[in-house]
Amino acid sequence: MQGSVTEFLKPRLVDIEQISTTHAKVTLEPLERGFGHTLGNALRRILLSSMPGCAVTEVEIEGVLHEYSTKEGVQEDILEILLNLKGLAVRVAEGKDEVFITLNKSGSGPVVAGDITHDGDVEIVNPEHVICHLTSDNAAIAMRIKVERGRGYVPASARIHTEEDERPIGRLLVDATFSPVDKIAYSVEAARVEQRTDLDKLVIDMETNGTLEPEEAIRRAATILAEQLDAFVDLRDVRVPEEKEEKPEFDPILLRPVDDLELTVRSANCLKAEAIHYIGDLVQRTEVELLKTPNLGKKSLTEIKDVLASRGLSLGMRLENWPPASIAED
């Protein structure tokens, strides 16, 4: 029975064709004309770029200082090994944002993901994945691998500048592909409901790396899309109040003790004798007032002026509401 001309059809049939544990086709129909591409493109973009997952982000290989090198007894160069590590499919227990796993292998033959040692919080989904090949019985390789939780794709170059100071020599960064979705495509076919033949049928064909089932991936992508669209349901001007940073009443340097100025013992003792304990106390004094201080001569005065000037301060400054409550309570 036909509904109102202004009423939108909602999909009534969802068919899931499970081709393998990592490959599935999901069919959604009927959709109003044009909605197949609207929803298909939105879901495709989210599945490719916004799905959370786990990936290798760093690796330390024994005897290797940088990625542009080779290791004796290993067929692949280091860059190729890093590329192979990107293909490692890892599932990490919820609540863990990063874990470390290790690999120690010796003897001729392939080194695979199944050779990796890990605890119960980690699962290697593709244990047959080849990492490298050892070329002799005396060859060996040892590495420590960092796996992190993230979203989308984060190239190593994006983390070089932020981690350069803390990263020791020999710790190699890896381009991180966090998304568990390997391939995603959609097509729109014709659908029919009673006498209407201008409707859409959306078919989503996708493959994952095994850490997430295709059906669950689509469900999560749809949830992300729905949450983002919620903001458009009610377009009243509801603004999230910006948190205003409270500016300190006084420059922090004024709250520091005069000992931080590292004056000579003579000058420091003279100031303490006059109950000048903080830099804020000092800058409010004039040259004339300081020269009246017992045992503080012109040499000490010059020293004080120079030290204050080096910090952008001077004598004779006026500070409203000094001292602050935190100092007054002391």
From Swiss-Prot:
It comes from Vibrio cholerae serotype O1 (strain ATCC 39315 / El Tor Inaba N16961). GO terms for molecular function: DNA binding; DNA-directed RNA polymerase activity; protein dimerization activity. The lineage of its organism: Bacteria, Pseudomonadati, Pseudomonadota, Gammaproteobacteria, Vibrionales. Belongs to the RNA polymerase alpha chain family. It catalyses: RNA(n) + a ribonucleoside 5'-triphosphate = RNA(n+1) + diphosphate. Keywords: DNA-directed RNA polymerase, Nucleotidyltransferase, Transcription, Transferase. Gene3D superfamilies: 5' to 3' exonuclease, C-terminal subdomain, DNA-directed RNA polymerase, insert domain, RNA polymerase, RBP11-like subunit. Coiled coil: none annotated. This is DNA-directed RNA polymerase subunit alpha. Residues 250-330 are annotated as: Alpha C-terminal domain (alpha-CTD). Homodimer. The RNAP catalytic core consists of 2 alpha, 1 beta, 1 beta' and 1 omega subunit. When a sigma factor is associated with the core the holoenzyme is formed, which can initiate transcription. The N-terminal domain is essential for RNAP assembly and basal transcription, whereas the C-terminal domain is involved in interaction with transcriptional regulators and with upstream promoter elements. Disulfide bonds: none annotated. SMART domains: RPOLD. It comes from the Bacteria. Residues 1-236 are annotated as: Alpha N-terminal domain (alpha-NTD). Its EC number is 2.7.7.6. One of its GO terms (cellular component) is DNA-directed RNA polymerase complex. GO terms for biological process: DNA-templated transcription. Pfam families: RNA_pol_A_bac, RNA_pol_A_CTD, RNA_pol_L.
